[in-house]
Amino acid sequence: MYIFFPKLNPIIFTIGPVSARWYGFMYVISFLFAMWYGKKCSIKNKKIWYEKKIETLLYSIFLGSCIGGRIGYIIFYNFSYYSQNMLSVFYIWEGGMSFHGGLIGAIIVMSYFSFKYKKKILEISDFITPLIPFGLGAGRIGNFINSELWGRVSPNFSYAMIFPNSQNQDLKEIKKYPELQLLSDQYGALPRHPTQLYEFFLEGILLFFIIYFFSKKDRPTGSISGLFLIFYGLFRIFIEFFREPDPQIGLLKNIITMGQILSLPMIIAGLIIMYKSCYKK
C-alpha cells in the first residue's frame, strides 16, 4: 500500500498578477529564524562584534547564498539550457537553486567580512553554521509542497509515495522497465521515495540538533564549521542514492550524481578543518 501525495496548493494567496508561494515563504521564515537565533547566540556568547554587525552580516549572507545558489544551479546542473535562455536566469520562481552554489556564495561574503573586520573566517562560519539547518529543512518542505525533487521509483517500498506530476519522468522508467506500466495504470503514477522528507529530517532536524548540542560547549575555532561540512556531505551523499537524478544530467558514468560529486569535497574539507582545529599545536 503506497502513500498518495496530499493535495497541497503551492500558492498561499494571489493578489492580481502576483502570487505568494510557500516555497518563497520558506526562504522568508528561514531568514527570520536566522536573524532571531543569530541575535540570541550573539548575546549568549557575548560577541560584541556580532551584536553590532549581525543584521548586515546575515542580510549579506542571505543575498550571497541566493545569488550563489542560482548561479551554482545554472553552472552545475543546467548550463546548456540557461546559456540559450538567458532571461530564464532571473525566473527564480520557476525553481532551480543549488545548496553547494549557495555555500560558495556565503563563503565569498564571509571572506569579505573576515577581511573588513579583521576576523578569522572560521570564527564567522562557526557563528553562522548553527543557523543553516533550519533553512535547509524549511526549503525541503517547500520542495515537498511544490511536489518536486522526489525520489527514485521504488515499487517494493511500502511507504513510497505517489507524486502525480512525476508522470513525464515515469514514462522514461516504464520505457526501461515495461512491467511498471501496470503500477502506473493502477495508481496514476509510479511510487517513489519522498526524499524531500528524508532531507527535511536528516539535513533539517537531525543536523540542527547535532550542531546545537556540539556548539553548546566552547569548541576550537573551526570545529563547528568542520562538523557541519562532514555531516551535511554524508547525509546528502546518502540521500542521493534515493533521490531522482536531475533529468538533464542523470547519473554521471551511470554511477554517481552531481550532488554526490559536489558533497564529497565538503566531507574532505570538513575533516581537514576538524583536524587542524582540534589537533593544531
Curated annotation (Swiss-Prot):
A 1,2-diacyl-sn-glycero-3-phospho-(1'-sn-glycerol) binds at R140. InterPro entries: Lgt. It comes from the Bacteria. Keywords: Cell inner membrane, Cell membrane, Membrane, Transferase, Transmembrane, Transmembrane helix. It is an enzyme of class 2 (transferase). It is found in: Cell inner membrane. The chain crosses the membrane at residues 11-31, 57-77, 89-109, 121-141, 194-214, 222-242, 255-275. GO terms for molecular function: phosphatidylglycerol-prolipoprotein diacylglyceryl transferase activity. PROSITE patterns: LGT (PS01311). GO terms for biological process: lipoprotein biosynthetic process. Catalyzes the transfer of the diacylglyceryl group from phosphatidylglycerol to the sulfhydryl group of the N-terminal cysteine of a prolipoprotein, the first step in the formation of mature lipoproteins. Belongs to the Lgt family. This is Phosphatidylglycerol--prolipoprotein diacylglyceryl transferase. The lineage of its organism: Bacteria, Pseudomonadati, Pseudomonadota, Gammaproteobacteria, Enterobacterales. The gene is lgt.
